[in-house]
Curated annotation (Swiss-Prot):
Protein's name according to its UniProt entry: Topoisomerase I damage affected protein 2
Consequences of knocking out this gene: Leads to cell death when overexpressing the camptothecin mimetic TOP1-T(722)A mutant.
Note: Present with 799 molecules/cell in log phase SD medium.
GO biological processes: negative regulation of actin filament polymerization; negative regulation of barbed-end actin filament capping
Length: 126
């Protein structure tokens, strides 16, 4: 499976998990979706299933936080270096305690399925 994970700007220094572990958690969740023969990804929303798996894993890791996960899906079929004509902007704001709460952003590409997932995870200390 050809996947690339790219970490984007975010405030993850106070994360309940180390940054590398967050990436692994997301990658494993995505891979388990792709490997599960009982899930029909043509009829089920990949992003909704991915959010569910990620949140379940985060909740198992620490119950001291509330978690929010967001996935934006881009279909990148037909895009190449000469024809990369799309623009996407996403802003998010929150009111929180910066020493305990934070945000992590990353990009997950599945070139086999011509999709790109822009994933944001927020954690709020209870």
């Amino acid at each position: 499976m050809s996947m690339q994970i790219e970490i984007k700007d975010g405030r993850s220094d106070n994360s309940p998990l180390p940054e590398r572990k967050l990436v692994t958690l997301i990658q494993e969740s995505y891979d388990s979706l792709k490997d599960d023969n009982e899930i029909n990804l043509s009829t089920e929303s990949t992003s909704n299933l991915l959010i569910k798996l990620v949140l379940e894993k985060l909740e198992k890791h620490s119950s001291l936080y509330k978690y929010i996960a967001s996935v934006t899906t881009l279909n990148i079929e037909g895009l190449n270096e000469e024809n990369a004509n799309f623009s996407l902007k996403n802003d998010i704001g929150a009111s929180w305690e910066s020493k305990k709460d934070g945000i992590f952003n990353y990009k997950l590409e599945d070139k086999n399925n011509n999709e790109c997932y822009l994933i944001t995870i927020l954690w709020l200390h209870k």
